[in-house]
Regions:
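Domain-level detector for long C-terminal conserved domains
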Residues: 1-511
Length: 511
């Protein structure tokens, strides 16, 4: 796409499809099935040992990913354990979405079963690519599927609805998977392409969501904020759904859909904007491909492959026990043996958001699982709030902050005087300018308001937790534009799939 490209609604001088719609607080209007098979916030190292227990920690650590989504946080955390650390690690992973649990189970079995030098690339494509090489499908069908088939055969006579557990051990590593009987049988379908699903249908099913005609203006709106050189790569992924560097040969990806995505012959399981870029730090992505900064999918490919390589190599020499559950996070205290005050880290994803279970229910239920400060002063329960500040941003705030935000925004976005004078609210440059207001917004006051409304102080006291004054896992606002940011930093953040208002809170025991 040329640098002079404009969205279709702009050149056709018409009202865009998104005009007049009731947009959600974050400004992202979703379209398609709402499965979160790929993360929508960057993966983080939940241990960050050098800033906490120390790089040479010798005691065992216990981690709980209560609403895990994909494996990004698990992989990044274990890949980051220093070689000087001699302690073991027990990792419990749960999600209430069976599609997520099934994919995570298969990926972990691949990491344990296959050699560390061959597993990363196969894991990468099963994780992110809509189409995969036929040899990857054969590899999991011939090596991983029999592991599940063996369990299904052994539990055939068990009562429907009963929980059944299986533990696989490979050297110092193990994986224990707990599912209901019928879920074990269902897991086998993730190794099979639906009968009669042709490649023509595969393309049509996916692009009916990712390139939907009724979303043309939404797509153009997103493309317009990208640097011109990035738009071609972005569209290539929208069309193909294959995670590869831009110029890489795709011949091996012509015949085989990824069965962990295509469980149905009727629809694509995710929203149109679902993108693997959202699950990793853009700064790290760009550092991976410094000579091809506009090929962000190349940078992502190299980053994920490298992280998976380090993950697979690290767990080869680590006493690590994985446990996978498929349940509501609020039921975990009843599922986990010896759970009371036993975890060094607990990650709740954004389940404490008001739109999910809320902060009170989340903390009352899961705070008792966190180690006391007397046992580990670095033990942390991590909550993420994606929507909090938008829920308390009222019309009066929108008016009151207008002048300050516009003034700061003009430092980064040049809106031509003739665009302003024309008064055309559907001008693409005017829309891009006004859409960027949240990037420069002061969210601290809004989050303070949200915490007061939800009685954070009272909840913390009730469950024996306090908010950490200094974060040692992740900054409170990791995606927010810093003061005196450069133009490059602004452009990078604006072009990301994040809403800039992601707020983390680190909780510690008061005892």
């Amino acid at each position: 796409m040329k640098a002079t490209w404009k969205p279709a609604w702009h050149t056709e001088k018409r009202q865009p499809q998104f005009a007049g719609t009731d947009r959600p607080p974050t400004g992202h209007t979703p379209f398609g099935k709402k499965k979160y098979l790929m993360a929508n916030v960057p993966a983080l190292d939940l241990l960050n040992l050098e800033q906490n227990e120390g790089a040479d920690v010798s005691h065992d650590l216990r981690l709980l990913f209560a609403a895990s989504r994909d494996l990004g946080n698990v992989v990044k955390t274990l890949a980051g354990i220093p070689t000087a650390s001699t302690g073991g690690c027990e990792v419990m992973i749960n999600d209430r979405d069976f599609d997520i649990v099934a994919r995570n189970a298969i990926l972990l079995l691949m990491a344990l079963y296959f050699e560390a030098d061959s597993a990363p690339l196969t894991m990468l494509h099963l994780w992110y690519s809509a189409l995969i090489p036929a040899q990857i499908l054969r590899a999991i069908q011939e090596n991983i599927r029999p592991l599940i088939q063996d369990v299904c055969a052994k539990i055939a006579a068990k009562r429907a609805g009963s929980f059944q557990a299986k533990k696989w051990t490979y050297g110092t590593r193990s994986l224990r998977l707990v599912l209901k009987k019928e879920e074990w049988n269902r897991l086998l379908s993730y190794f099979e392409i639906p009968d009669g699903l042709s490649m023509t249908q595969v393309h049509a099913i996916r692009t009916a969501t990712t390139l939907a005609a009724e979303r043309r203006d939404y797509l153009d709106r997103w493309l317009y904020i990208l640097p011109p050189a990035r738009r071609v790569g972005a569209m290539k992924f929208r069309v193909e759904g294959i995670l590869l560097p831009f110029g890489s040969c795709r011949r091996d990806f012509d015949t085989t859909p990824n069965p962990t995505f295509f469980q149905s012959k009727d629809s694509w399981p995710m929203v149109d904007a679902a993108d693997p870029l959202d699950g990793w730090s853009m700064a790290e992505i760009l550092r991976k491909a410094p000579l091809a900064r506009n090929d962000t999918y190349r940078g992502l490919f190299l980053l994920v492959q490298d992280t998976l390589q380090r993950f697979c190599q690290r767990i080869e020499n680590l006493q690590v026990k994985f446990q996978l559950f498929h349940d509501d996070a609020l039921a975990l205290p009843n599922m986990i043996e010896d759970g009371q005050h036993s975890f060094d880290r607990i990650k709740l994803s954004n389940m404490a958001d008001r739109g999910w279970v809320g902060p009170e229910a989340a903390l009352i239920t899961l705070a008792p699982l966190l180690k006391r400060a007397s046992d580990n002063p670095h033990a942390i329960l991590l909550t993420l709030f994606l929507n909090a500040v938008h829920e308390v941003f009222y019309d009066t705030d929108n008016i009151a902050s207008l002048h300050e935000e516009m003034s700061r925004l003009r430092s980064y976005v040049n809106l031509a005087p003739d665009v302003v004078l024309a008064g055309d609210k559907f001008n693409a440059d005017f829309i891009m300018f006004t859409d960027a207001r949240p990037v420069v917004r002061d969210f601290d006051k809004l989050f303070d308001r949200w915490m007061r409304e939800h009685r954070f102080g009272d909840i913390g006291k009730a469950v024996g937790l306090k908010m950490g004054s200094e974060h040692t896992i992740v900054p409170p606002w990791p995606m927010r534009l810093r003061q005196n940011a450069t133009q490059r930093e602004f452009d990078r953040l604006r072009a990301s799939g994040h809403v800039e208002s992601e707020r983390y809170v680190e909780w510690k025991s008061v005892e």
